[in-house]
């Protein structure tokens, strides 16, 4: 089955995203988990999510795709930025459990002078810290353009990140 949808605004809540997609004729959608240029996230309201899940069932929706904010950088050189980003990643993965079977897409980040190898190790470490192996979300690493100190500029770098995951994290 092929599902087609759009990237919709999450500003009015989960059910509103679903209704907007139905109005557009789609049967899936992508959305940002939080402010794409910041770190703040709205509180999740159980009843809002339940109404979305009902709408998705009624309209035969496929899996959803959530996109992490662009500011998340789990391999940042500055420890405070890296810690904040890892906490954001943890929170986003936790939040994705409200939408079983969804995909969570994020840009690996920028090593900012540490070198690609260090960046790859930090990204794998962040994922190992955030993934329990019991979550239902599928995590997608998005390729980067490769400018500056971006990590994930090639499939080889993405493979190295995945190789750095603990075995039980990959078996889910």
Model regions and ranges:
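Histidine-centered active-site/metal-ligand motif
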Residues: 7, 67, 107, 111
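Hydrophobic alpha-helical segments and helix pairs
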Residues: 89-136
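Short, well-ordered coil/turn segments that N-cap beta-strands
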Residues: 1-4, 25-27, 58-64, 98-102, ...
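Conserved, mostly hydrophobic/aromatic
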Residues: 21, 67, 85, 96, ...
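Alpha-helix N-cap and loop-to-helix initiation/capping positions
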Residues: 40-48, 76-88, 114-125, 149-160
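Active-site-proximal beta-alpha loop/turn segments in soluble metabolic enzymes
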Residues: 73-74, 105-116, 139-151
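Acidic/histidine-rich catalytic cores of soluble enzymes
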Residues: 29, 124-172
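N-terminal pre-domain/capping segments
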Residues: 1-66, 72, 76-91
């Amino acid at each position: 089955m092929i599902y087609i949808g759009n990237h919709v605004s999450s500003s009015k809540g989960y059910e509103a995203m679903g209704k907007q997609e139905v109005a557009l004729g789609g049967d899936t959608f992508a959305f940002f988990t939080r402010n794409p240029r910041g770190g703040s996230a709205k509180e999740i309201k159980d009843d809002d999510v339940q109404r979305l899940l009902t709408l998705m069932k009624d309209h035969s929706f496929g899996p959803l795709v959530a996109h992490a904010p662009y500011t998340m950088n789990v391999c940042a050189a500055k420890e405070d930025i890296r810690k904040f980003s890892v906490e954001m990643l943890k929170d986003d993965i936790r939040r994705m459990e409200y939408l079983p079977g969804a995909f969570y897409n994020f840009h690996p980040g920028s090593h900012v002078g540490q070198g690609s190898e260090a960046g790859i190790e930090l990204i794998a470490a962040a994922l190992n810290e955030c993934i329990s192996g019991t979550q239902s979300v599928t995590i997608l690493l998005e390729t980067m353009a490769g400018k500056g100190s971006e990590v994930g500029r090639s499939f080889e770098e993405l493979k190295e990140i995945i190789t750095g995951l603990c075995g039980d994290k990959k078996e889910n």
